[in-house]
Amino acid sequence: MEQTLVLIKGDGVRRRLIGEIIRRLENKGLAIRDLKMMRVSRELAEEHYAEHREKPFFGELVEFITSAPVVAMRVEGEGAIGVVRNLMGATDPAKAAPGTIRGDLALSMPDNLVHGSDSPQSAARELRLFFGG
């Protein structure tokens, strides 16, 4: 079974959407294998977003993810990475289709509620960062 990292970002926590987002994941046949609410340190944020370090929005990403608690989840299921990516919808909520988490619930950038790993390599790296091992 494939595993992936899903983060419910601070805007989702503040808006009390944790249960709704988990319900949508489980309704797609995915299982939550690990879950924790945490504050992301600057160091963890910078490592998590390392691929964007040279981009102009890097600082904004780090500030946003460290500004409030997040819910980190190890999610498992058949084709979990693709299932999660489709369920999340487009990165920009204005472009996300109805029926997706961002299309139905997100307000605007950067408040797009969730993060999901984009490849098996990213999933392995991100799960190690957030859950160890």
Swiss-Prot record:
ATP binds at residues 9, 57, 85, 91, 102, 112. The keyword ATP-binding applies. Keywords: ATP-binding, Cytoplasm, Kinase, Magnesium, Metal-binding, Nucleotide metabolism, Nucleotide-binding, Phosphoprotein, Transferase. The keyword NADP does not apply. SUPFAM superfamilies: Nucleoside diphosphate kinase, NDK (SSF54919). It is found in: Cytoplasm. GO terms for cellular component: cytoplasm. Its EC number is 2.7.4.6. Its cofactor is Mg(2+). The active site is at 115 (pros-phosphohistidine intermediate). GO terms for molecular function: ATP binding; metal ion binding; nucleoside diphosphate kinase activity. It catalyses: a 2'-deoxyribonucleoside 5'-diphosphate + ATP = a 2'-deoxyribonucleoside 5'-triphosphate + ADP; a ribonucleoside 5'-diphosphate + ATP = a ribonucleoside 5'-triphosphate + ADP. Pfam families: NDK. Homotetramer. Major role in the synthesis of nucleoside triphosphates other than ATP. The ATP gamma phosphate is transferred to the NDP beta phosphate via a ping-pong mechanism, using a phosphorylated active-site intermediate. NCBIfam families: PRK00668.1. This is Nucleoside diphosphate kinase. It comes from Rubrobacter xylanophilus (strain DSM 9941 / JCM 11954 / NBRC 16129 / PRD-1). The lineage of its organism: Bacteria, Bacillati, Actinomycetota, Rubrobacteria, Rubrobacterales. The gene is ndk.
